């Protein structure tokens, strides 16, 4: 139940974030889109294609590190639906570089959210 709650799962949920994103972090390694949701917690969705990252090992690593960076950040306390889209550069990054980049960019998202609009 907790796992289902914390993930953007359906096509409708993904479309809502794409169509109505309020927050956007455009890094060379990935794109982070987010929109406010009606919950008291964040939900995370990830998109990493075979074209972007040909090997399943690298795709799964990207997903694992994204979930880890999400858990370590304070994003789970903010009511957002978040999608992280992998780009080709993620394929060439080390674990450490990818985790650091995700951590920094999740912090930028937190800062954007905290800024009064």
Q: Model segments located where?
A:
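Positively charged, solvent-exposed patches that mediate nucleic-acid binding
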Residues: 1-117
């Amino acid at each position: 139940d907790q796992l289902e709650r914390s993930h953007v799962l359906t096509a409708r949920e993904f479309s809502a974030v794409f169509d109505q994103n309020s927050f956007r972090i455009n890094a060379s390694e990935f794109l982070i889109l987010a929109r406010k949701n009606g919950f008291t917690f964040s939900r995370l969705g990830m998109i990493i294609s075979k074209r972007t990252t040909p090997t399943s090992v690298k795709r799964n690593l990207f997903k694992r590190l994204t979930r880890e960076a999400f858990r370590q950040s304070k994003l789970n306390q903010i009511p957002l639906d978040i999608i992280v889209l992998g780009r080709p550069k993620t394929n060439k990054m080390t674990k450490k570089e990818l985790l650091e980049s995700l951590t920094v960019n999740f912090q930028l998202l937190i800062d954007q959210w905290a800024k009064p609009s």
